[in-house]
Amino acid sequence: MEKKKLIYIVDDDLFINTLIVKRFNSEDYVVESFITGEECLDSLDKNPDLIILDYLFTGESLIFSDGMQIFDKIRQLKPQIPVILLSGQEKGEVVLEFARKGVFDYIVKDNNLIDNLAVSIKEVFSREV
């Protein structure tokens, strides 16, 4: 039996976190959710197979205020882990910057979020074969 893939979702929006965990926790995936980048980074020793990362975070006590900072730290610590970025809006310059840095995919949080994420997750794991 093949080991389940470990996916991290990092988003300060509890609705999005819950939606993704409920949809993708399955026979194939184990999904762990985090509200802050710090929580995710503290758990990188579990070596997730994929990280789904929000672009914009809110909160006064956060060390990391946006997904770019968290992404850079993930790349520094675990460069082999693919990252899918989520955002509430399409920003061309942000998409280009993340593409240059090596993000696997950039998905807008819209009505097609779950469908688009499902396709992207399959693409990530199909490239491992």
Give, region by region, the residue ranges found by the protein language model.
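Receiver (REC) domain switch/output surface
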Residues: 116-129
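Conserved phosphotransfer cores of two-component systems
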Residues: 45-46, 73-80, 101
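Alpha4 helix (beta4-alpha4-beta5 surface) of REC/receiver domains from two-component response regulators
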Residues: 69, 76, 89-107, 111
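Short amphipathic alpha-helix used as the core "switch/output" element in two-component signaling
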Residues: 61-79
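Two-component/phosphorelay signaling modules centered on CheY-like receiver
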Residues: 14-33
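Conserved acidic carboxylate
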Residues: 11
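Acidic, metal-coordinating helix/loop segments flanking the phosphotransfer/catalytic sites
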Residues: 32-50, 54-59
